[in-house]
Design a protein with these regions (language model features):
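N-terminal secretory signal peptides and thylakoid transit peptides that target proteins
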Residues: 1-16
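A short helix->beta-strand "capping" segment at the edge of beta-propeller domains
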Residues: 34-53
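A short beta-strand motif characteristic of beta-propeller blades
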Residues: 45-50, 102-107, 144-154, 190-199, ...
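Beta-rich, blade/repeat-based domains predominating
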Residues: 54-62, 111-120, 153-167, 200-214, ...
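Short loop/turn segments that connect beta-strands within beta-propeller blades
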Residues: 98-101, 139-143, 185-189, 238-242, ...
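Blade-level signature of beta-propeller repeat domains, shared across WD40, Kelch, NHL, RCC1
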Residues: 261-295
């Protein structure tokens, strides 16, 4: 199967019937040659808040009721990759907790290797990162409403997801196959807007995103072998143009950020406890929910 590169994706007829606005100017904005222009003197500092419920917390979302946390379970090839036993129960949960970590509500889903979540429109949107892939739309009583693949891919496999968010009635997906942030109408499931991932040799890992007053923050990081070698950063995009506005590196020995959400002007994240290439629970903040302050 041919995977479209960024130039092909933006130029090869995307606007012809797909309803997607191509951000050609954004495709070059994150190249390493321009990285110094956006690199900030600010730093991201992490502060632990509370431990997540059982399992691997791999996505977060904020609503008026509290904080939602998505559970990731490792099954099949993912369990083998991390040398873990196959779970007896493959159900992956979304927990609503208060700001002390007390569980207020649990929603059960059939998502697999959940790596993104949004909450909006009366539903939880759980994003799978292994077969059967796609986005699981589940109501607050754990009834599955739909299971649909990320748009612009094969009908049975739109690729993996590493983040999601809900804003103004639209679902945003961090689409790994497309290598960008894709805005989708949640009813028609038509793609509407696309922002290419920030592109730099030392930032090859992409995670979740959060809305911030007309801008979007996304977690990026480097491939490495352990927590001490990890250099995560926050990229800030202009949500209207896709232009990269700022790159903020985390302080050394910070928590390992996976999910991302905004709460009263502060970024909230989670440390799943597993990371490709690392020993399990190598991060000292494994399974913690934490706040990110920009200092």
């Amino acid at each position: 199967m041919h995977t479209l590169n960024k130039r092909e994706f933006l130029a090869a007829g995307i606007g012809a019937g797909l309803g997607l606005t191509a951000l050609r100017s954004a495709s070059a904005q994150g190249k390493a040659s321009g990285a110094n222009n956006i690199r900030s003197s600010r730093r991201a500092k992490t502060t632990k808040l509370f431990r997540s419920p059982e399992g691997f917390p791999n996505a977060v979302a904020v609503t008026s009721e509290g904080l939602w946390i998505a559970e990731q379970k490792l099954s099949g090839s993912a369990a083998a990759q991390y040398h873990m036993a196959e779970p007896k129960d493959l159900t992956e949960h979304a927990w609503l907790v208060d700001w002390s970590g007390k569980v207020l509500k649990t929603v059960s889903t059939q998502s697999r290797n959940t790596s993104g979540m949004a909450v909006g429109g009366g539903y939880v949107w759980m994003c799978a990162n292994q077969s059967p892939e796609g986005v699981f739309q589940v109501d607050m009583n754990s009834k599955q409403i739909s299971h649909r693949q990320i748009p612009l891919g094969p009908s049975d496999n739109g690729g993996g997801c590493h983040g999601a968010m809900w804003h103004d009635g639209k679902l945003w997906i961090a689409a790994l196959r497309l290598r960008g942030l894709l805005r989708v109408d949640p009813v028609s499931w038509q793609p509407e807007f696309f922002i290419p991932f920030y592109d730099a040799p030392d930032r090859a890992r992409y995670h979740a995103m959060a809305w911030d007053n007309g801008a979007i923050w996304q977690i990026v990081g480097n491939d490495c072998k352990n927590h001490s070698q990890y250099r995560p950063a926050l990229v800030k995009y202009d949500a209207a143009t896709g232009r990269v506005m700022e790159l903020i590196e985390f302080e050394p020995d910070s928590a390992d950020p996976h999910g991302l959400a905004m709460n009263d002007g502060a970024l909230i994240s989670c440390d799943a406890g597993i990371h490709p290439g690392w020993e399990n629970n190598d991060s000292p903040s494994s399974h913690w929910i934490f706040r990110i302050d920009l200092v």
